[in-house]
Each structure stands twice: as C-alpha cells, then as structure tokens.
Amino acid sequence: MSIYHDVIKSEVFPALGCTEPIAVAYAASLAAERLGAEVETVTASVDPGVFKNGFAVTVPKTGGLKGNVIAAALGALIARPELKMEILSGADERLLAQAELLVSSGRATVALVKERTDLYIDVVVTGGGRTARAVLEGGHTNIVRLECDGRILLNADEPVSAVDSHAYRAVLRQMTFSEMIGLLDDLDQGDLVYLKRGVEMNLRIAEEGKQLTKVGHYVEELVRKGFLLADVVSSSKILTASASDARMAGLPYPVMSSGGSGNQGIVAILVPYNVGMFFHVPEETILRSIALSHLVNAYIKCHTGDLAPICGCAIAAGVGAAVAIVYQQAGPDMHKIDLAVNTIISDIGGMLCDGAKGGCALKVVSSTDAAIRAAYMALNGHGISEEEGFVGKSAEETIHNLSRIADKGMALVDDTMLCIMLQKRSTEP
C-alpha cells in the first residue's frame, strides 16, 4: 500500500458531526461494547485540542445539545463501535433521553488533561459492577488501549494495524511537494470513485446548509444585493460556508473529512471541485487535484500537529486547495506551487483556532477566498517571495517555518484560550 492510500485510509473518511466530540463518542462506544452491561457512568479525559474543539459545537442527533460530554454519554449508550466516525447515526430518542440523564445527574463527565500535546481520548465506562476502558491516541480512530475489568485486551505494543499506528506520517513528513505529486500515479479507478464520493457527500451537506440563515446565507445575500460579484470565488465561498454551517449546526448529514477534520474536508474538496468545474477541467483531473489537496493537508498537519493553535482550514486545507487549483491549470509546475503555498500562508497563516463552533464557517470563507486568490496570483507568476516575513525559498521551507511558529512561538496560545473558555463556563448560569 502506498503513502497515498495510507493517508486516505487514516485521514479521509465520512464523519457525522465535528470529529473531536465524535471521536469521544467512538471511544466511549468502544469501552461500552467491552463492558457488556448497562452503562452507569462515563468518564472521559481528553487533551486540550479535543477539549477545545468539543467545547461549543453542536452534536448531531441531540436536538441542538453541545459538547464532548453529551457525545461521550450518547456514544457509550449506542455501543456500536463498528460505526466509527458515524457512530451517532445509531442514536434515537430513547438513547438521547438516557444520555441526557447521565449528564444531568453528573454520571457522565469530561476532564481536561493539560499535559497532553497530541490527540488523546481516554474513556472509562462502568456498569453492573464492571469497568471498561478505551484509549485513542494520535488519531481520531487510532485505538491504543482496550481494557475490561483490569484485563488488557489491546495495548500500544499491539496496534490495530500498521496504518492506525500512523507510521506513514514519518515518511510523509520528509516528502517534497514534487514527490507528493508523483504519488498521484498510484491512483486507480477505485480511488477516483472514493474521491468522487467525497465530492458528492460534501455537496449534499452544502445544499442542506443553504437552508440555514447562517454564514453561507449572508454571503449569498451579499451577491444578490450586488456587494459581491456572482463569480467562481463567491460561489465557492457560498458552497463551503453552507457546508460548514450545516456541520457546525449538527445537521445529521456526514461530511468527507480531510486530515481527520470535516471542515478541512469541506475546503480541501469543494474549493478545487468548484473552481475546476467553472473552468471546465476534466473530471479525472479535478479528482486527482483533490487527492493532491488531501496529501498537502496531511503533510502540513504532520508538521504543525493535528490540533494546532492555528486554524487547520487556513494553514492546511486552504493550502491544499490552492495547490490543487494550480495543479489543475499548470500541472506539476513547482515554481507556481511554491508561489501559491507561500502566498496563502503569508496571507492567513496566523488565523487562530479557538475550537469548533458556528464561527468556523467564517474561517472557511476566508480560507476559500485566500486559496483561490493565491492560486490565481501563482498561475500568473506572482506571489509572496522569501524576502518577506517568515516565508521561505520553497513551499517546504515555508511550512517548516510555520511549524516552528505553531510549536514554539505559540506555545502559550492554547493555554490562554482554554483559560478564557473555562472562565466562561464557570460564569454560566
């Protein structure tokens, strides 16, 4: 199996709802299945990134409820881990009522583990005098430990699969953009079918999102009233914002993710798709460009981390979309790809991530706009040069510099944001 297929298998999958609370639900479901008894308590411990992303986002199939705690309770009661990131498709009114009771009675809780810097979800479920535990680490579905009544069923020394252990990331991290483009030669008809499924899935949720009076609605209204042109940039922004609106509002429709993120999947897939269709690019070329978009998104997150203090839609998916557009028009022209990457990162590389929520659609719009603009400039031989700011000589060097900023320069950003968010919670009535 190639690096491309490892990336797709691990990071590009359908997800019903925001991927962090859904991963919490999945972990709870894993533990509850092993428990084999009626669930009495659910205790989840999560890293700052998962805590932040599940803080204010609406969870599907809950009637508008928000947060990791309802996701944990509902996932444990569903107890169908085979559904993975579509775990909440197994919810119904009866299970929701039971989950709400677990939460309101204090028998379902979520704790923050501040010292964890990677994706980490640890869920303990009790019932009938028994205790079961499931731990996910380094990926939304990467199981590293399963226990029941103190008996270890799986541990980190025996990963579920080579792909789940994310060994491919060490290889991907060292690749060049030219080498990633070379991976597109590995695509077969089955890969193209899967990529097209992602397009169709994300288009469907975008159409549902257009029924909401949220960000996508107002971008569309700006076009209708003449404030924005009715062009490919505006139509792309309406499409991506509407899809994000639907997802953040908890509408019960799956989205094809990228880099383990639904919003990143929306940008990485729909932007190159819509631009390609506008310019009558052959469908296979569009699909191959989307594959490249996924690879670039995964590559950048290998450097910055899965849940960095900076917005993944901006510095990962937006970059992937820009590269995809250049690839559609100019093929593997590395000079133009370097220009596109450097330009979009210089533009929106400092966009903060303050958790998943309705406002993410605004960042999706900004990322969409910046990706198309950067690609257009690059295709015309213009862009930000190494003489400016933290931009490097190449796409790879710029991403390395961005990684340094995210890791060292913004080390206190997440702590500060979490403090603010926790203070808000403590003052809620």
From Swiss-Prot:
Q: Which HAMAP family match?
A: UPF0597 (MF_01845)
**Per the similarity annotation, which family is this?**
Belongs to the UPF0597 family.
**Which InterPro entries does the annotation name?**
Ser_deHydtase-like_asu (IPR005130), UPF0597 (IPR021144)
Q: What is this protein called?
A: UPF0597 protein GSU1527
Looking at the Swiss-Prot or TrEMBL record, what is one Pfam family this protein matches? Answer: SDH_alpha
Organism of origin is Geobacter sulfurreducens (strain ATCC 51573 / DSM 12127 / PCA)
GO-annotated biological processes: L-cysteine catabolic process to pyruvate
Identify a single GO molecular function assigned to this protein.
L-cysteine desulfhydrase activity
